[in-house]
């Protein structure tokens, strides 16, 4: 039993070799967004509400970019496993083209419908002046953030390809540089330090956009200046040719991932909108809770990425089913352990953390209780995340689409919608009930893992 779930030193060296750079990058990114959030929180509850609503909407765009490049990424990891540089070059081109298209479509949607989208979250009980102020701050923030769409999408194209070809340090370095640039500029521009004007939420947006360009310069610059290491980049832009057969394969395997990320993230946005109908205090309280949760979930989410990469490489290299299952079981055990540990830490700081924000006692108290509920659910989230990446690594993208998005829209969203519209249920039981739907997904995920249909080599 002991060796069933616990690996040897070589196993952990391999896992942490892949996971630690991703954890460091995501950890620093989330830690800095926590500091950003606290800085914006010092400006007041109303600007914080506006910014948090916009960030919730931008999350949908970010995950669409991630989903679009992930579909091709399944093939990149397996091409790397079979040492096929030409294959990697084609997947890189696919990512490049689709990420540009998503950036342009996303910018058009937010330019035309930004005001209506933000307004959906400001319908809860509370005074009209608060809602109008939050809308105004949100629109100013959004207008500047749109300038960061293209560099974000291109950075994702380069960074994901480097990670899938075994280079995790440079994306980490680019990410770290970007978050420090963001942090320093935030401090200067939000509060008007060193002779700069005091710009509040607009300063936060300018800092983020500049940091996106810095990250792109580092990651793309390194890729192009190390052509011997990154053979795929040689001639990558000479044409945009992608073989029809591969294009079909990526589209068939990858489209469910893109649609999945869009539906899942937009489902999360709808859930937030349902919660917001319980009162205007819910928006800032949820923002405080999700900021801490995002930092706490870094390790298990990064472990999920590692599960996908390690499983993809093993499947591409043709390992036996027994080996693949054994490694997968141990990876999931590490993931659950991280969820238990960080869930415990979140619960421990649930009372103290909301005290950092310049907001009302009612918002702080509500945030502390929401943090507790999130902390209890974290181990289950970590199991689901590892399961999702396992199924995806073998190309089971349609199954993961059913598992993730269909469940969200068929079950979670209607449940939250009905409870928020047709009952007087307060926010805490409403949030707890919606979170508890993860228990059902855990059962479904376990059945899918045991079936083993995900164990397949896509490169042959």
What residue spans do the PLM features occupy?
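Small-residue hotspots at the loop-to-helix junctions and early N-terminal turns
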Residues: 45-56, 138, 142, 205, ...
């Amino acid at each position: 039993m002991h060796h069933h779930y616990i690996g040897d030193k070589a196993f952990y060296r391999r896992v942490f070799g892949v996971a630690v750079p991703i954890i460091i990058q995501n950890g620093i990114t989330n830690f800095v967004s926590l500091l950003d959030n606290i800085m914006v929180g010092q400006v007041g509850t109303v600007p914080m509400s506006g910014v948090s609503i916009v960030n919730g909407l931008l999350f949908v765009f970010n995950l669409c970019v991630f989903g679009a490049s992930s579909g091709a990424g399944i093939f990149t990891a397996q091409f790397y496993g079979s040492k096929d540089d030409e294959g990697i070059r084609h997947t890189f081109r696919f990512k490049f083209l689709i990420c540009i298209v998503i950036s342009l479509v996303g910018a058009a949607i937010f330019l035309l419908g930004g005001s209506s989208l933000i307004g959906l979250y400001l319908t809860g009980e509370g005074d009209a002046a608060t809602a109008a102020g939050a809308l105004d701050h949100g629109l100013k923030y959004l207008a500047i953030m749109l300038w960061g769409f293209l560099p974000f999408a291109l950075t994702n194209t380069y960074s994901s390809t480097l990670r899938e070809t075994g280079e995790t340090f440079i994306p980490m370095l680019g990410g770290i540089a970007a978050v420090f640039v963001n942090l320093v500029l935030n401090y200067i521009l939000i509060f008007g330090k060193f002779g700069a004007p005091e710009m509040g939420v607009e300063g936060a947006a300018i800092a983020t956009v500049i940091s996106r360009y810095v990250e792109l310069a580092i990651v793309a610059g390194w890729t192009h200046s190390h052509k011997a290491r990154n053979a795929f980049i040689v001639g990558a832009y000479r044409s945009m040719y992608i073989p029809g057969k591969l294009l079909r394969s990526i589209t068939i395997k990858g489209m469910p991932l893109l649609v999945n990320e869009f539906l899942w993230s937009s489902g999360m946005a709808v859930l937030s909108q349902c919660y917001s109908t319980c009162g205007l205090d819910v928006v800032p309280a949820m923002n405080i809770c999700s900021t801490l949760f995002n930092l706490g979930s870094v390790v298990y989410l990064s472990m999920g990425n590692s599960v996908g990469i390690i499983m993809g490489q093993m499947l591409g290299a043709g390992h036996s089913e027994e080996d693949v299952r054994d490694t997968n079981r141990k990876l999931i055990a590490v993931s659950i352990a991280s969820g238990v540990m960080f869930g415990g830490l979140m619960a421990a700081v649930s009372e103290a953390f909301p005290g950092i924000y310049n907001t009302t006692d009612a918002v702080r108290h509500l945030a502390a209780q929401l943090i507790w509920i999130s902390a209890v659910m974290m181990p289950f989230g970590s199991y689901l995340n590892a399961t999702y990446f396992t199924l995806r690594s073998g190309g089971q993208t349609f199954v993961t689409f059913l598992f993730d998005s269909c469940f969200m829209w068929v079950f979670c969203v209607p449940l939250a919608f009905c409870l928020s519209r047709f009952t007087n249920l307060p926010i805490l039981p409403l949030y707890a009930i919606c979170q508890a739907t993860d228990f059902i997904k855990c059962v479904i995920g376990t059945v899918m893992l045991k079936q083993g249909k995900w164990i397949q080599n896509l490169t042959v």
